[in-house]
Amino acid sequence: MTRTTSQLNELIEITRDGQRFYQHAIQEVKDARLQRLFQSMAQAKTDVINALAGKVAANHEDPATGGTLLGKLRQVYADTRATLASDEGATYVAQLEEAEDRILHAFEDALEKGAPETQALLRAELPKVRACHDQMSQLKHSLK
């Protein structure tokens, strides 16, 4: 596996963590507004994953199909906190915002240290990643 593929697959896995977390949260929250938002965010993650996977496949490599252990642990942690919290929606929003932080930092790090052949793709996807991050961050702060 090339360095480029490895880097892109890592971003795919981290982004998939977010996608799966949003999909899970849709089932857990009762607020229809949050469910719609989480669905939109999950779709945004799917779009980013597809763009990254397309680049990996174009290099005749196999795109990552899973997530990370850290992503799964964060989801379990959020479930536990939501069970104990009085406002499950705010708990999921806070944990999803942290997932967005992780995704954003991974993309920024990849842009800074990544392979030159991925720069254009990462620059194209970064505004989408940042927009999701900013939206969840604003929502988290509005719920405090």
Can you say where each PLM-predicted feature lies in the sequence?
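N-terminal first-folded block
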Residues: 29-31, 56
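Terminal, compositionally biased segments
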Residues: 1-3, 20, 36, 58, ...
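Conserved alpha-helical segments that form or flank metal/cofactor-binding pockets of metalloenzymes
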Residues: 36-70, 135-139, 143
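Alpha-helical scaffold segments that form or flank carboxylate-/histidine-based iron centers
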Residues: 4-11, 32-51, 89-93, 118-129
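Charge-rich, acidic-biased intrinsically disordered regions
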Residues: 43, 61-79, 121-128
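Amphipathic alpha-helical hairpins/coiled-coils and adjacent low-complexity
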Residues: 50, 57-60, 64, 101, ...
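Acidic/histidine-rich alpha-helical segments that form the ligand environment
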Residues: 7-27, 72-123
